[in-house]
Structures are given as C-alpha cells and as structure tokens.
Amino acid sequence: ALPPLLLHSIFSGSVDALEHWINVRPNNAVTVLDTHDGIGVIDIGSDQLDRSLKGLVPDPDVDRLVETIHANTQGESREATGAAASNLDLYQVNSTYYSALACNDQHYLATRAVQFFLPGIPQVYYVGAMAGANDMELLKRTNVGRDINRHYYTAEEVEENLKRPVVQALNALCAFRNTLPAFDGTFSYQRD
C-alpha cells in the first residue's frame, strides 16, 4: 500500500490515509516503492468483489490518483496499462515511480525518504535506483505493459545516471539510512 499512498499524499496534499496505514502496518516488513511490475493501486481502494468493504482511500480519489499518474507521464502509463499493452492486470498502473511523479526530483527524494525512515528494510528496484523514466522504446518493441519499467541499462548508462544529482542524493540517503544506529531502534512519530 505504501507506493500508491505516498503518491496520493504528494498529489492530494492529504496524509490522512498514509497516517492510518502507518498506524496499522507491520514493523517487520520490506518497504518498496517500485518493482518489476506496476504500481498496485488496488492495495488502497475498496475490495473489488465487495465495494462495501472500503479501502484506505475513497474510490474517486483512487481514480484521480490513476489519472494524475497518466497526466504526469504524458499518457505513457495509459499506453502501458490494461488491454492496450497485452496486460490483463487492470489493478496496477504500469510506470516507473519516478515517471509517476512527473520526474520531479524533489518529490521522488521525499517519497524515498519516507520509505527509508519507516520501520522495515527498504528495497529499491534497480530502475528506481537510477531514478529511471518510462522505457517507451522497450514497450513498443514488446507490447508488454510492464516492460515500461524494465529498462536494460548499459554500463555507459549506469555511469551517466550515477552522475545525476537525483541519483547521487538517493545514494546519500541510502548511506545515511544504512549507517545511522537510530534505524535499529523503536519507531514513533507525531503529526503536526
């Protein structure tokens, strides 16, 4: 639930659903924002078989979240999601996390900071580690929606990306998270 909840908070300015999830989530988890698949919006909405079982975010807000991702990616995620891209999984939006945030470095690093500072073990997918944008060339070659988020980096591309300020800041955040003893302690927070 964390990936779409953070997007919802960034896009809407509301942290209510995120705060609720923080209060009920497990402490012994691997935290992720991106994987080889898309962004699982089903995790925060109503039960698909019984709409009376409400989710963390009201369904109209989930719909707005999906449309905001489509707008932020200039329609790339729409091209890669659902039947349009040989993808029958309609409960996720196929996009890199960075592209879902309109390639906004500040928003990307803010969401990563929340991920890293929550209890658990943060995992960063290799495309996320490069703050990678949607791979439309690969999508066009394969017509597999999830391939938008599966760029094959050459050694040269890795070297170039490691010089980008957003990737350097992400690596610094990783080092901070992994070396500070406070992250081995007990978690608490207070909402202002």
Regions found by a protein language model. Name each.
Residues A1-D192:
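Active-site and adjacent substrate-binding regions of carbohydrate-active enzymes
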